[in-house]
Amino acid sequence: MATLTGLTFGGQVWTPQFVEAVNQDKCIGCGRCFKACGRNVLILQALNENGEFVEDEEGEEIERKVMSIIHPEYCIGCQACARACPKNCYTHSPLEHN
């Protein structure tokens, strides 16, 4: 398999690491990763006390909020989300082609 690579402005080989998962058990819902990502990959979602996703409206019982991946196809592999995350919630991997 071939791995997608690129070059930095300085000419060094760079392998983008694309977002795979967010550990929602570790996520504190601070939103730092959301602010760091300019590609609309992430969304902050509300969880009820049973750990189920619910609408973020006044009538719903919200236990906490966590980050979720809504558009993984928009990820450019920069890992800005992981660098901004204080709880190390992100898993990334290179893109491999057959």
UniProtKB/Swiss-Prot annotation:
<protein>
    <recommendedName>
        <fullName>Ferredoxin-3</fullName>
    </recommendedName>
</protein>
<feature type="binding site">
    <location>
        <position position="33"/>
    </location>
    <ligand>
        <name>[4Fe-4S] cluster 1</name>
    </ligand>
</feature>
<feature type="binding site">
    <location>
        <position position="85"/>
    </location>
    <ligand>
        <name>[4Fe-4S] cluster 2</name>
    </ligand>
</feature>
<comment type="subunit">
    <text>Homodimer.</text>
</comment>
<keyword id="KW-0004">4Fe-4S</keyword>
<feature type="binding site">
    <location>
        <position position="75"/>
    </location>
    <ligand>
        <name>[4Fe-4S] cluster 2</name>
    </ligand>
</feature>
<keyword id="KW-0535">Nitrogen fixation</keyword>
<feature type="binding site">
    <location>
        <position position="37"/>
    </location>
    <ligand>
        <name>[4Fe-4S] cluster 1</name>
    </ligand>
</feature>
<feature type="domain" description="4Fe-4S ferredoxin-type 1">
    <location>
        <begin position="18"/>
        <end position="47"/>
    </location>
</feature>
<feature type="binding site">
    <location>
        <position position="30"/>
    </location>
    <ligand>
        <name>[4Fe-4S] cluster 1</name>
    </ligand>
</feature>
<feature type="domain" description="4Fe-4S ferredoxin-type 2">
    <location>
        <begin position="66"/>
        <end position="95"/>
    </location>
</feature>
<comment type="function">
    <text>Ferredoxins are iron-sulfur proteins that transfer electrons in a wide variety of metabolic reactions.</text>
</comment>
<dbReference type="InterPro" id="IPR050572">
    <property type="entry name" value="Fe-S_Ferredoxin"/>
</dbReference>
<feature type="binding site">
    <location>
        <position position="78"/>
    </location>
    <ligand>
        <name>[4Fe-4S] cluster 2</name>
    </ligand>
</feature>
<dbReference type="InterPro" id="IPR017896">
    <property type="entry name" value="4Fe4S_Fe-S-bd"/>
</dbReference>
<dbReference type="GO" id="GO:0009399">
    <property type="term" value="P:nitrogen fixation"/>
</dbReference>
<keyword id="KW-0677">Repeat</keyword>
<keyword id="KW-0479">Metal-binding</keyword>
<keyword id="KW-0411">Iron-sulfur</keyword>
<keyword id="KW-0249">Electron transport</keyword>
<feature type="binding site">
    <location>
        <position position="81"/>
    </location>
    <ligand>
        <name>[4Fe-4S] cluster 2</name>
    </ligand>
</feature>
<dbReference type="InterPro" id="IPR014283">
    <property type="entry name" value="FdIII_4_nif"/>
</dbReference>
<dbReference type="GO" id="GO:0051539">
    <property type="term" value="F:4 iron, 4 sulfur cluster binding"/>
</dbReference>
<feature type="binding site">
    <location>
        <position position="27"/>
    </location>
    <ligand>
        <name>[4Fe-4S] cluster 1</name>
    </ligand>
</feature>
<keyword id="KW-0408">Iron</keyword>
<dbReference type="InterPro" id="IPR017900">
    <property type="entry name" value="4Fe4S_Fe_S_CS"/>
</dbReference>
<dbReference type="Pfam" id="PF12838">
    <property type="entry name" value="Fer4_7"/>
</dbReference>
<dbReference type="GO" id="GO:0046872">
    <property type="term" value="F:metal ion binding"/>
</dbReference>
<keyword id="KW-0813">Transport</keyword>
